[in-house]
Curated annotation (Swiss-Prot):
It comes from Vibrio cholerae serotype O1 (strain ATCC 39315 / El Tor Inaba N16961). GO terms for biological process: L-histidine biosynthetic process. It is an enzyme of class 1 (oxidoreductase). NCBIfam families: hisD. This is Histidinol dehydrogenase. PANTHER family: HISTIDINE BIOSYNTHESIS TRIFUNCTIONAL PROTEIN, HISTIDINOL DEHYDROGENASE HDH.
Length: 431
């Protein structure tokens, strides 16, 4: 990790060191994904079987995972694993249930009533990546809010063979439409539908460059599907003072660095002594990590920033807008009102990022790459939509009519004006 003193940098240099590396998917990926999407749209299930065999080197007997297969997966899991997943499920459920929107009903003026009601998105698709280790935590983070929101159809796709842990959590979340599908072909199938796979309205979940590009392409097509949020590399920023535990900070930085070589890891502290201690602790802990080579690549482009004060550290963090923000200071709670841009915040010595990744109850699907300025952590609202309702009495319309008529005339919209005046005239004749 490179250490810099913030005050010694020019404004241009400060902006430069906080600039994230460009995400370049490349023309090859864009074209390849477009071909996959076109093939799935034209050939349906046949394309899904062909592409699954080509990319995943698996030839599933069926695209859809049966209820019997899901029950068998549950039976194979250890009780310890089941209990851990159930505890995480309960915590995540509790936090997301608290997010339920309450109906709003306001009389804005006599006889004019406005309401806001919330409805679930009808059909949603969840993408769960494959890889060397299963990701049941991602199923929890997507499946629980979909379940609580009341989405009528929830479709889950994951590359075969699907891990028992993933199938067990799908069962916990009452997801019974699970498919042996990965990559861009899974996104295309959910976005457009096939003979077997249900077309959904919105797609959630992380993935590799091909999945990310497929989500981008289908979200730009009005015939496709909406998506959760833009994707980017994982990142963490730690604000710490001289009271922080250097070993804790090193562990938190490394837990993010092991995600991938493009992960962003930043420590901001007013204490040069702590900065040196963290540098030493990172090197010691790195030696015992199974993914040390990956973490080392991420650390090579990571930073320790020496700030003048915690106030300046907060300013740096707000400018950067990290996905994960850890605050290890003497009074971390006092900084919360000053923090504007972060996906999820972890306060104090006993709140490692890992708890949010798995089981504290918050959602680990977070905006990254600076999108925290405008996007929020995933929650119940993302699986819902708002509708407004207005109802006017005859007296209410007559009271509001002059305002609407004046504004419609100013905008040159005569039909808008007439939709009001024709009613007012009828009321006046009846008097």
């Amino acid at each position: 990790m490179r250490t810099v003193v913030w005050q010694s940098l020019s404004e241009a240099q400060q902006e430069s060191i906080l600039e994230r590396p460009a995400i370049t998917e490349g023309a090859n990926i864009t074209a390849a994904v477009a071909q996959v999407i076109a093939k799935v749209r034209s050939e349906g299930d046949a394309a899904l079987f062909e592409l699954t065999e080509k990319f995943d080197r698996v030839k599933p007997a069926s695209l859809r995972v049966s209820r019997e297969e899901m029950d068998a997966a549950a039976a194979r899991l250890s009780e310890t694993m089941k209990q851990a997943l159930e505890q995480a499920y309960n915590n995540i459920s509790k936090f997301h249930k608290a997010q339920k929107a309450q109906p709003i009903k306001v009389e804005t003026m006599p006889g004019v009533v406005c309401e806001q009601v919330t409805r679930p998105i009808n059909k949603v698709g969840l993408y769960i990546p494959g890889g060397s280790a299963p990701l049941p935590s991602t199923v929890l983070m997507l499946g629980v809010p979909a379940q609580i929101a009341g989405c009528r159809k929830v479709v889950l796709c994951s590359p075969p063979p699907i891990a028992d842990e993933i199938l067990y959590v799908a069962k916990l979340c009452n997801i019974d439409e699970v498919y042996n599908l990965g990559g861009g072909q899974a996104i295309a199938a959910m976005a457009y539908g096939t003979e077997t796979v249900t077309k959904v309205d919105k797609i959630f979940g992380p993935g590799n460059a091909y999945v990310t590009e497929a989500k981008r392409q289908v979200s730009n097509d009005f015939r496709g599907a909406a998506i959760d949020m833009p994707a980017g590399p994982s990142e963490v920023l730690v604000i710490a003072d001289e009271t922080a535990d250097a070993n804790f900070i090193a562990a938190d930085l490394l837990s993010q660095a092991e995600h991938g070589p493009d992960s962003q890891v930043v420590l901001v502290t007013p204490s040069p002594v702590l900065a040196d201690q963290v540098t030493d602790a990172v090197q010691k802990q790195l030696k015992v990590l199974s993914r040390a080579s990956i973490a080392e690549k991420a650390l090579a482009s990571s930073l320790i920033i020496i700030a003048e004060s915690l106030t300046q550290a907060v300013s740096i963090s707000n400018y950067y807008g990290p996905e994960h923000l850890i605050v290890q200071t003497r009074n971390p709670r006092e900084l919360v009102p000053l923090l504007d841009n972060a996906g999820s915040i972890f306060l104090g010595d006993w709140s490692p990022e890992s708890v949010g990744d798995y089981a504290s109850g918050t959602n680990h699907v977070l905006p990254t790459y600076g999108y925290t300025r405008t996007y929020s952590s995933l929650g119940l609202a993302d699986f819902s939509k708002r509708m407004t309702v207005q109802e006017l009495t005859a007296d209410g319309l007559q009271l509001l009519a002059p305002t609407v008529v004046t504004m419609a005339e100013a905008e040159g919209l005569d039909a808008h004006k007439r939709a009001v005046t024709i009613r007012v005239e009828k009321l006046q004749k009846a008097q």
